[in-house]
Amino acid sequence: MRDLKGIFSALLVSFNEDGTINEKGLRQIIRHNIDKMKVDGLYVGGSTGENFMLSTEEKKEIFRIAKDEAKDQIALIAQVGSVNLKEAVELGKYATELGYDCLSAVTPFYYKFSFPEIKHYYDTIIAETGNNMIVYSIPFLTGVNMGIEQFGELYKNPKVLGVKFTAGDFYLLERLKKAYPNHLIWAGFDEMMLPAASLGVDGAIGSTFNVNGVRARQIFELTKAGKLAEALEIQHVTNDLIEGILANGLYLTIKELLKLEGVDAGYCREPMTSKATEEQLAKAKDLKAKFLS
């Protein structure tokens, strides 16, 4: 099995103004991540890819383009989770056939699913696809808060490799790593890379890595090497950048920063605001000049 540790960009998707997928732009984003950001892999089909506003066929098209462009240069994780289990299975089978290294699935959301229902969801995707699985835990968006015992139940399935941990509960993170040292944890909050790395995470998956991947790796590797003061200085700069991005509109701003690098990052998918305002464009230029030049 391919090594899935390290720095993974949560892949942005370029859309045309009419909302269709901009294949040329998407390929440029992928190449930028591989050639410039030097990431270890891509997490395809997640929140950053505006996934939950897309049709099944559009999701498949993005999986296809990403695999065709990246080939075997880096590791690829396909996020196939959906509140529709049949869609999750269909996407999982498709990504597996394409040769994705691993699947991931967000916990089923909106309805208040019981834990046995959540476990059934993961076990079904795994059984139907035969691929490995990374649980995607993002409780502030899904409302699903799992404890250490529940993760332990999921980990009884040998195909569950670990969790993408997008939560602020670092006590739970530490407890999980101690209780299940052979299961991997990917940090999901870019702004908390240093504390996550100090607690032993195996990698990180982040949206801002599309433009700030080099610093993300520096923070991760310096922290692992015990050089905390150096790592903290880079985390400070990173968080200044992230603060500016968040204040200006997360996905729009990252796309505008990519455009300033010559990447056709396109528009966002409605009902998100699809196009940056002049004020947002000016702020993106300011962020690039301060942090990415």
Swiss-Prot record:
It catalyses: aceneuramate = aldehydo-N-acetyl-D-mannosamine + pyruvate. Keywords: Carbohydrate metabolism, Cytoplasm, Lyase, Schiff base. Belongs to the DapA family. NanA subfamily. One of its GO terms (molecular function) is N-acetylneuraminate lyase activity. This is N-acetylneuraminate lyase. PANTHER family: N-ACETYLNEURAMINATE LYASE. GO terms for biological process: carbohydrate metabolic process; N-acetylneuraminate catabolic process. The active site is at Y136 (proton donor), K164 (schiff-base intermediate with substrate). Homotetramer. One of its GO terms (cellular component) is cytosol. Aceneuramate binds at S47, T48, T166, G188, D190, E191, S207. InterPro entries: Aldolase_TIM, DapA-like, NanA, Schiff_base-form_aldolases_AS, Schiff_base-form_aldolases_CS. HAMAP family: N_acetylneuram_lyase.
